[in-house]
Amino acid sequence: MIKEYYGAETFILNKDFAYILVIGTTDVSLIPGLTIAGATPELTHFTPAADAEYVLLGKCKSINTIPVSPTGIPTPALLTRASLSFINPLKIVVNAGSRIVPKIPYIDLQGEPGKDIRKQALSMEKVNNIIENSIKLGEELSNEYELIMIGESIPAGTTTAMATLLALGYDAMDKVSSASPDNPKELKRKVVEEALRNLPTDPLQRLAKVSDPVLLGVAGTSLGFKGKILLAGGTQMTAAAAIINEFDKNKLKDITIGTTKWIVEDKFADMLSLAKQVGVKVLASMLDLSISAYEGIRAYEKGYVKEGVGAGGSAIMALVRGVSNNTLVRKIDELYGELVGSNNLHI
């Protein structure tokens, strides 16, 4: 049910944990054809806030429906909420820099939304804010927890992740995943190559040029936390791990990436080679959604969406605690059915 890579072990996950969802936006998501993490490019800026609202409330306030792809495939926040319903951990939303802020309580890192990486993603002032404040958050969480799970929501985040990995010296071109089964590799490559021109030599200035607020918020929270960390995400979390490694070469021994089989088995990406380069362990949930009653859920098995909002890590946490595949899929179907029945989802 869970596959282990590079020395990852599931036994460390059998303790109380807090779920941290770091949200933000990047104007890269407005580039047509780059992401399907929203019904239109403009709606991608609402996706992180709506994801956060749905995980906490079971409904969205920022938009009148949960985020969907242009073809109606639901957000992975649905999988996250279903998995966490069996555990009920503390859930904290962290705004690293979202264009639309959620209408729920959240912690603000005093960052800013990411701009177009082909010009300049973030100001140095905001980069420092995000890193310093997220480190402090991690330190405070250490007072209560020995384990945290960090998820992310930022449309076009795989593109900024690829730019970040390349800027830090990793062989990452064409190796990141996509929410679409048709990974727009040529467009991503073109955007990233343009972003990487005339890079400054200082690593922090490089991150300000091509990264995004979420990667910095995830990295900072991890750097401040004293216990074990499950980075719940796909190829984006290899970029977060790379940033962590820039600051503290010893930190990755306490960190594991928890993702989905759809990420590690993605033929159009190579998440495992990225994790190996960075030096981070990986766990993958083998959750099978082909038995779902709903086509929108079964679409995940065809390569749609794949990961996000901590879906893979949350499934791992549920499976480690004895929740069966069938039970988890029934819960996902139940939540999806409620959305369809209440007209909170247009399919």
UniProtKB/Swiss-Prot annotation:
InterPro entries linked: Nict_dMeBzImd_PRibTrfase, Nict_dMeBzImd_PRibTrfase_arc, Nict_dMeBzImd_PRibTrfase_sf
Pfam families (UniProt xref): DBI_PRT
Name assigned to this protein: UPF0284 protein M164_0030
Listed NCBIfam families: nicotinate mononucleotide-dependent phosphoribosyltransferase CobT, PRK04447.1-1, PRK04447.1-3, PRK04447.1-5
One Gene Ontology MF term: nicotinate-nucleotide-dimethylbenzimidazole phosphoribosyltransferase activity
Tree of life domain: Archaea
Family to which this protein belongs: Belongs to the UPF0284 family.
